[in-house]
Regions:
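N-terminal Rossmann-like NAD(P) cofactor-binding subdomain of oxidoreductases
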Residues: 1-161
Length: 161
């Protein structure tokens, strides 16, 4: 890979967004461009994530101020990204969803666990972003332009069986 890719995280003040930010700050091919939070807009990242003090000078911006990037990570509550898909998908060619919005392909199964899906027409677009190899006890991220990241329950059991 040549050059760094710019990355922005929507919902970076939460646990999943904060952990993704922590990892991205150390990645040799990523440059974190923006992080959003409505509640903490204008505050430095370390105000919410003290473990990142001295690692970045980024400040939270409101989602409305989000600029285009190469990669957009969405760490929003379940259902929010799906409802605002058109807005966010226009900002980056690569989307990584940390919520449950696009983990399941079957709208009936989604309804069973999360309620009615706001955009069932998009369920087939996202790739489940982790492949687990139970024989080797490992996993790998698969490349795609729209990734649905599994929760811990989806990855951990095969690794420890």
């Amino acid at each position: 890979m040549t050059g760094k890719k710019t990355l922005s995280i929507v919902g970076a003040s939460g646990y999943a967004g904060g952990e993704f930010l922590r990892l991205a700050l150390s990645h040799p091919y990523l440059e974190v461009k923006q992080v959003t939070s409505r509640r903490f807009a204008g505050e430095p990242v370390h105000f919410v994530h003290p473990n990142l003090r001295g690692r970045t000078n980024l400040k939270f911006v409101p989602p409305e101020k989000l600029e285009p990037a190469d990669i957009l990570v969405l760490a929003l509550p379940h259902g929010v990204f799906a409802r605002e898909f058109d807005r966010y998908s226009a900002l980056a060619p690569v989307l990584v969803d940390l919520s449950a919005d696009f983990r399941l392909k079957d709208p009936e199964l989604y309804r069973r666990y999360y309620g009615e899906h706001p955009r069932p027409d998009l369920l087939g677009r996202f790739v489940y972003a982790v492949r687990v190899d139970t024989s080797a006890g490992s996993f790998e991220l698969c490349p795609a332009d729209a990734c649905a990241v599994p929760g811990a329950d989806g990855v951990a059991p095969p690794l420890f069986s």
